[in-house]
């Protein structure tokens, strides 16, 4: 492709609203442009990268036995109402009405549509298993779109769905697609981890996220320093053991703590270590209010609270709800004196506290010498806190470290969550009606482009891996007015294309500095510069990833490039 014919507007300055490298560079290099908050146009070079990621996805999905189809972006509300998600999915679901006031959603995901499609067509175990996928635009009404393609309101996604007669069949396909995902992200050149995850609004169980390691990631990964264990911090169980001290229990005492609300403030004011304080929080579990206790140096993991109750929705109780329940401010909450009708659950670590402190459910006061079971009753001790760095790894090997990650893929074992809700059944080999067993597998295709850009860049621009680069080679005749340089550049361009390489020829009448700056921004794997030594048959070859350059004879160029790009 000749650069003079391409729409690739570059920017010298960093856009003011672009916070992270991938967002900045994809805009500066002319790979995309913003249409509205969280909505982007892919320009020609960006679209080439997107298509290359799509191709890798398609190759690996089809190798895993999945078949492509395409479903509508606009979905009837009735299907979402049938599954129950019309009411539970929340405000991120983009809803609309047609001229007849019939309600629709713009698809954030397609479980309902695919289940409806398959239940009408697949009636026998003989047609199972079946794995279908699509690559299609999704919509999500993000409250705060940010980070460019990483959190947008419109994005390209590959979503696959598998249908099975048995759990064993689901397990087999799940493992196959797990490996396909690993292959996809490895082929894209990404440094990633597959981690144990929470299924969230999707439902189901046994789920893994594929996380690209990056400091700008919105998720925290807990991983072992000596084993392969990795999990989203929300899902990492705590296996610590707590030893109760043999300190004698002291008499409970209420003390004044004026203007001291946070654990750090209270512990400093009372000269008590945070790990001897009891942190009390009120959660709304579906429609039930529950008091949750953790040690003062720990944080409540609301996903674990949700899993204790098998709840659909768990959120912190509002200030008004806390006031009505316990007649106190949030900063003064404590378990002592709580009405017996209100359930109290606690993390395992709380049981080991001796002569600790807690809120007194009275503004400006706390209790000291608090002892669980003597001073208050707990209905259940269980794992309720977030794992911390330095904790023992849940697999028993090594200790936990943290890293940030960008979620680019997610695989779920949905089970019968949707098939039961939507009456999607089949006849098994005994002629009995059974609900279809399902799996769900998603990849953020446009998000993967951003994740690659986030991992592969330097101070000068993008540094694309060969597999997804818009072109393999960038040929730059420095001076297009020089017949020797122009002709050699065009000859190299034609010759490399004949060898099967994708080549970009900078045939613009621009200054050398502009050409080189744009080349660095674009980040193609190899740059061939045709300069003043063209008369001698010599060109300069530069590897973008390493910055290494070498002058070689033009007749050696094809072999040289083949060695770089092999």
UniProtKB/Swiss-Prot annotation:
User: Which subcellular locations apply to this protein?
Assistant: Cytoplasm
Fetch the Gene3D superfamilies from UniProt: Anticodon-binding domain, Bira Bifunctional Protein, Domain 2
Alphabetically ordered keywords of this record: Aminoacyl-tRNA synthetase, ATP-binding, Cytoplasm, Ligase, Nucleotide-binding, Protein biosynthesis
Enzyme Commission number: 6.1.1.15
Catalysed reaction equations from the record = tRNA(Pro) + L-proline + ATP = L-prolyl-tRNA(Pro) + AMP + diphosphate
- Might you name a Gene Ontology BP term for this protein? prolyl-tRNA aminoacylation
Entries under InterPro entries matching the protein? aa-tRNA-synt_IIb, aa-tRNA-synth_II, aa-tRNA-synth_II/BPL/LPL, Anticodon-bd, Anticodon-bd_dom_sf, Pro-tRNA-ligase_IIa, Pro-tRNA-synth_IIa_bac-type, Pro-tRNA-Synthase_IIa_type1
Question: Which Gene Ontology cellular component terms are annotated?
Answer: cytosol
At the top of the EC hierarchy, this enzyme's class is: ligase
Task: Name one molecular function that GO assigns to this entry.
Answer: transferase activity
| Entry superkingdom | Bacteria
Q: Which NCBIfam families match?
A: PRK09194.1, proS_fam_II
What information about domains appears in the record's comments? Consists of three domains: the N-terminal catalytic domain, the editing domain and the C-terminal anticodon-binding domain.
- Describe the subunit structure: Homodimer.
Give the family per the record: Belongs to the class-II aminoacyl-tRNA synthetase family. ProS type 1 subfamily.
What this protein is reported to do is described as: Catalyzes the attachment of proline to tRNA(Pro) in a two-step reaction: proline is first activated by ATP to form Pro-AMP and then transferred to the acceptor end of tRNA(Pro). As ProRS can inadvertently accommodate and process non-cognate amino acids such as alanine and cysteine, to avoid such errors it has two additional distinct editing activities against alanine. One activity is designated as 'pretransfer' editing and involves the tRNA(Pro)-independent hydrolysis of activated Ala-AMP.
Q: What is this protein called?
A: Proline--tRNA ligase 1
């Amino acid at each position: 492709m000749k650069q003079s014919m391409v729409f690739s507007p570059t920017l010298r300055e960093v856009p003011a609203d672009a916070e992270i490298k991938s967002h900045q560079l994809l805009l500066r290099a002319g790979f995309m442009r913003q249409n509205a908050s969280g909505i982007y146009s892919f320009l020609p070079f960006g679209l080439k990268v997107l298509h290359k990621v799509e191709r890798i996805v398609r190759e690996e999905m089809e190798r895993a036995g999945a078949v492509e189809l395409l479903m509508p972006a606009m979905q009837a509300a009735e299907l979402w109402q049938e599954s129950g998600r019309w009411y539970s999915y929340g405000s991120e679901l983009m809803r609309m009405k047609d001229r007849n006031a019939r309600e629709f959603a713009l698809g954030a995901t397609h479980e309902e549509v695919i289940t409806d499609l398959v239940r009408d067509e697949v009636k026998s175990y003989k047609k199972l298993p079946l794995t279908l996928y699509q690559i299609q635009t999704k919509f999500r009404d993000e409250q705060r779109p940010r980070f460019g393609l990483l959190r947008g309101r419109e994005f390209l996604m590959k979503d696959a769905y598998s249908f099975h007669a048995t759990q064993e069949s689901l397990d087999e396909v799940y493992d196959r697609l797990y490996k396909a995902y690993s292959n996809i992200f490895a082929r894209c050149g990404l440094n990633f981890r597959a981690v144990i995850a929470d299924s969230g609004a999707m439902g189901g169980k046994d789920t893994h996220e594929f996380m690209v390691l990056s400091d700008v990631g919105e998720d925290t990964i807990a991983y072992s320093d000596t084993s392969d264990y990795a999990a989203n911090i929300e899902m990492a169980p705590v296996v610590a053991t707590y030893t109760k001290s043999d300190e004698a229990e002291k008499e409970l005492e209420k003390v004044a703590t004026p203007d001291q609300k946070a654990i750090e403030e209270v512990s400093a004011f009372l000269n008590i270590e945070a790990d001897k304080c009891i942190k009390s929080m009120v959660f709304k579990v579906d429609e039930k209010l529950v008091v949750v206790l953790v040690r003062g140096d720990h944080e409540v993991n609301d996903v674990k609270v949700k899993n204790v109750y098998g709840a659909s929705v768990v959120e912190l109780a509002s200030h008004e709800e806390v006031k009505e329940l316990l007649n106190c401010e949030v900063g003064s909450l404590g378990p002592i004196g709580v009405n017996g009708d209100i359930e109290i659950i606690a993390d395992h670590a709380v049981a080991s506290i001796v002569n600790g402190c807690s809120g007194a459910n009275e503004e400006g006061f706390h209790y000291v010498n608090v002892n669980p079971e003597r001073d208050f009753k707990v209905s259940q001790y269980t794992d309720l806190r977030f794992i911390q760095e330095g904790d023992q790894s849940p697999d028993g090997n090594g200790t936990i470290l943290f890293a940030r990650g960008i979620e680019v893929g997610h695989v779920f074992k949905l089970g019968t969550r949707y098939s039961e809700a939507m009456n999607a059944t089949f006849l098994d080999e005994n002629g009995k009606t059974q609900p279809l067993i399902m799996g769900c597998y998603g990849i953020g295709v446009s998000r993967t482009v951003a994740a690659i850009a986030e991992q592969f860049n330097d101070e000068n621009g993008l540094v694309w891996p060969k597999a997804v680069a818009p072109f393999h080679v960038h040929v730059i005749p420095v001076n297009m007015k020089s017949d020797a340089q122009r002709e050699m550049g065009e000859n190299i361009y034609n010759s490399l294309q004949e060898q099967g390489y994708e080549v970009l020829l900078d045939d613009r009448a621009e200054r050398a500095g502009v050409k080189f700056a744009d080349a660095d921004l674009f980040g193609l794997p190899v740059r061939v510069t045709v300069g003043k030594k063209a008369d001698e048959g010599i060109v300069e070859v530069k590897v973008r990833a390493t910055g290494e350059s070498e002058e070689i004879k033009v007749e050696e160029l094809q072999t040289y490039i083949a060695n770089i790009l092999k």
